[in-house]
Amino acid sequence: MTICKAPLLAVVDDDAEVRMALTRFVSSAGFEVEAFESGAAFLRSVDDHEPDCVLLDLHMPGTNGFDVQRAMAPAHAGVPVIVITGHDSSEARARALSGGAKGYLCKPVDGATLLQTIDAAIAGRTAKAGWRRP
């Protein structure tokens, strides 16, 4: 039997409580997780360690979520981004989705909805690797 490596998710959020809660939740669902306290910290690591999916806050000091999306393209355009924000607006939603986000969720995030969104976003990557969430 071949054991497949779990997909790697990057959690990028400046709020430590949210970052830790998301990390614990997706880890318990079987994903590998790297957490980043800022968009700049994530961008410094992405070239060396590309995740299978990014859970991205929009409103962070310094390098915000929109900046991260823009900086990821084109080198990492194939990495799905799911925006998780506490500041919902139709303008932000449209901007994130037009920037390539595969999902847009508002805090507080429902766990089942988050997992469904992640599964849909990484379906192509995990099908190739043969991984399924436990």
Predicted segments with their positions:
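Acidic catalytic/metal-coordinating carboxylates
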Residues: 37-38, 64-68
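Alpha4 helix (beta4-alpha4-beta5 surface) of REC/receiver domains from two-component response regulators
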Residues: 67, 88-103
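Receiver (REC) domain active-site loop signature in two-component systems and cognate sites
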Residues: 60
